[in-house]
């Protein structure tokens, strides 16, 4: 997993309180990790803060899995 992927994983574990082993690229935030819509909004905000970038609403709607978040942030992260 990339350095950005590891940071994404850490944020997901902290925000959702899930076991690190469950946070894999194809894990759906809602279906696999038990997030609700508020959790997903909070995750997006945490990603924006951690990586110094804005995630527009239309992009946020396409970030459904850990891998989706990692791919988006690898392209758009400022830090």
Swiss-Prot record:
GO cellular component: cytosol; membrane
Database matches in InterPro entries: ACP, ACP-like_sf, PP-bd_ACP, Ppantetheine_attach_site
Record PTM text: 4'-phosphopantetheine is transferred from CoA to a specific serine of apo-ACP by AcpS. This modification is essential for activity because fatty acids are bound in thioester linkage to the sulfhydryl of the prosthetic group.
Keywords assigned: Cytoplasm, Fatty acid biosynthesis, Fatty acid metabolism, Lipid biosynthesis, Lipid metabolism, Phosphopantetheine, Phosphoprotein
Subcellular location per the Swiss-Prot or TrEMBL entry: Cytoplasm
Biological pathway: Lipid metabolism; fatty acid biosynthesis
Domain Carrier: 2-77
Pfam families, sorted: PP-binding
Keyword hit for Phosphoprotein: yes
GO molecular-function terms, A-Z: acyl binding; acyl carrier activity
Residues modified to O-(pantetheine 4'-phosphoryl)serine: 37
One BP annotation, GO: lipid A biosynthetic process
Protein's UniProt keywords contain Phosphoprotein: yes
Function: Carrier of the growing fatty acid chain in fatty acid biosynthesis.
Family: Belongs to the acyl carrier protein (ACP) family.
Matching NCBIfam families: acyl_carrier, PRK00982.1-2, PRK00982.1-3, PRK00982.1-4, PRK00982.1-5
HAMAP family: Acyl_carrier (MF_01217)
PANTHER family per record: ACYL CARRIER PROTEIN, CARRIER DOMAIN-CONTAINING PROTEIN
Protein name, UniProt field: Acyl carrier protein
Originating organism: Bradyrhizobium sp. (strain ORS 278)
Gene, per the UniProt record: acpP
